[in-house]
Amino acid sequence: MKKIVLATAIFFSGIFFTNAQNATPLKKQFIFSAIKGTVSKPDSVTLPPATITARFFSGDTSSFKILSYKKLKLILVFTPSPDFIGITKAKLQVRTSSGNTILKLIGLSTKGLEGENEPTLATVADALGYKINIGWTTLANHILPELQGDEIPYSLFHKAGKGKVEIIPVARYSPDFELPFGYYIDSAEKPEMHQVGVLAKTNEYPEHQCLFPAIASGGNSFDPGNHIFGFYATGPTHTAYSEDVWNMLFYPANAVRATRIYPLKDSTGKLINNNYLLCYEEAKNGDFNDYVFVLKNITPVTTDLFTSLFNGKNLDGWHTFLKDIGKNADPDTNFIVQDNTLHVVGKDLGYAITEKEYSNFHFKIDFKWGERRWGSRTKEKRDAGVCYNIPMNEPDSIWPRSIECQIQEGDVGDFWLLGFSIIKVKGVQNQPDNHTRMQKYTDGEKPTGEWNTVEIISYNGKCVQIVNGIVVNVGEEASVKSGRLLMQSEYAEVYYRNVKIRKL
């Protein structure tokens, strides 16, 4: 049992007891991190003037050390052994004239720097004393938008109450660089970013691979006023946003889901109101331990940012067009609305098209193939599509000038440039023609018969097409930048649902 005597005499004066009673409450918990066989960054506590002794009395006392004690300031470090990896704990008892106080000591020991040496996000949360279901226990996971564990589906926030919002860095396991971080609000052209602080590079200690990384400049709080806001962090190659849409649009080669946000819970699992854990993914392996912040005094925006374009009851807000039949004429009942779904039988060639036009938007739609095929599609791949940015003055035809997100078995996400429209994909522009194909560069489809989600972002001439959370095609400098949208009927039975749009 380790013991350090801090005072050998006690003076029972009235002044002494007043000072002791009014002293700042002791910090009760100390959390350290270090690579195995090394010494952590120190932490300290100022003990009450009435302190008599401080001693380690339970747990893994060999992994913690009292570095020094001067003028009531006690400095502690974590010293894991060269063969220990994981979390260890001990307790330090501070004895004063008015009683005893127990200080809890927690240490996280890791294998080494970066890569497979890093702790899992679940381990990080455990070391920090947060009983959160992260959703996975391995190091790597994935960057798809499916919610994991206790993750919330919201990425924008309000300030919850008076005072400032706090954004406190509590963990970082990333490559070594300075990291600006902060919040953003909506503006006319793009997110308006407000830097709060900058995480430090490695110095005497590996600040990029530790708990409670140092801030090189700035602070850890801000006041957004009444604005709705999201969070961002900027690494050497890209900025990661709390909203997927900006990651898809600005940095489609990186993680689409760049943050996972969890309600903060204490060590017993009790919810800490208006507090959240913000976890960033810097690369694409899905570990989400790159930069981790505790957020305080915030509440999520829970209203849906999307507007439904299809009411599930009828085609109000749309009109239909069928080849050789015309507008709003459907003698063979090609379009059937039932169970909040648009069932396109597909016997006729045509579409349902919006009456309104849209610019700078994020569009979503679910589709599923049916069984039947007709005409030229009897022995071919099932085919359909979503066309967008159709000019208001463009007459109904097969097919109007637009950009098409191909929905065809095996090819979902291809660009088709219709009516001599053009776009550049990876720096190469299509040849203008009645219809030109620009193939997707990766695949995200589910097997025929399952529901798929297709997303389209059109923003100032840049078009991003996403299939089941995977960016499959990106085009720039499109010749058509705004307009109407349509859902095709192209000789294959298909079902559409959850048709909605968000103005950006």
Where are these regions (language model features)?
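Feature for long, exposed domains in two main contexts
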Residues: 21-115
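A recurrent domain-boundary module in secreted/ectodomain proteins
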Residues: 283-302, 499
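Bacterial Sec-dependent N-terminal signal peptides
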Residues: 1-23
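Propeptides and adjacent flexible N-terminal/non-core segments of secreted
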Residues: 76-79, 95-100, 108-268
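Low-complexity, Pro/Thr/Ser/Gly/Ala-rich linker/spacer regions in secreted
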Residues: 110-117, 298-308
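Carbohydrate-interacting regions of secretory-pathway proteins
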Residues: 302-504
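Short beta-strand-plus-loop segments that form exposed binding edges in beta-rich domains
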Residues: 233-236, 280-285
